[in-house]
């Protein structure tokens, strides 16, 4: 009888603990820190990497079709057949140099504000960087015409 009471009290304590944890919405991370939920990026390196990764991927998504189009149209040209390589290199080198700094600045602002970043925010900031570069590049070309 006493054992049944002890087991019942332990189950009540465990249920109360689970409710408390779920109400706080804290999920333990791999490095023993806690974060708002499992898709939140709390650490500076997580935020930086998330934004940087989306910037690189979206830059390649913009540059790969341009390189394929250049390859298809310039394949018989004597010198310009190598332009697609330059386009692909700029699709990789641009985010490696510029994207590293801007992603670090975004992650630094979030970390200094004490906020966590959702994965969707990292996507928006990463793709936003590539869109911004695309728009600026397009406007520079229009200015030369």
UniProtKB/Swiss-Prot annotation:
Keyword DNA-binding: no
Membrane-crossing residue ranges in chain numbering: 51-71, 82-102, 118-138
Residue ranges annotated as Cytoplasmic topological domain: 72-81, 139-145
GO biological process: endoplasmic reticulum tubular network organization
Lumenal compartment spans: 1-50, 103-117
Lipid bilayer topology: Multi-pass membrane protein
A GO cellular component annotation in the UniProt record: nuclear envelope
Alphabetical UniProt keywords: Endoplasmic reticulum, Glycoprotein, Membrane, Nucleus, Transmembrane, Transmembrane helix
Localisation per UniProt entry: Endoplasmic reticulum membrane; Nucleus envelope
Glycosylated sites: 31, 37
Family membership noted in the UniProt record: Belongs to the TMEM170 family.
Matching PANTHER family: SD17342P, TRANSMEMBRANE PROTEIN 170A
Purpose of the protein: May regulate membrane morphogenesis in the endoplasmic reticulum (ER) by promoting ER sheet formation at the expense of ER tubules.
Protein name: Transmembrane protein 170A
Species name: Danio rerio
Gene: tmem170a
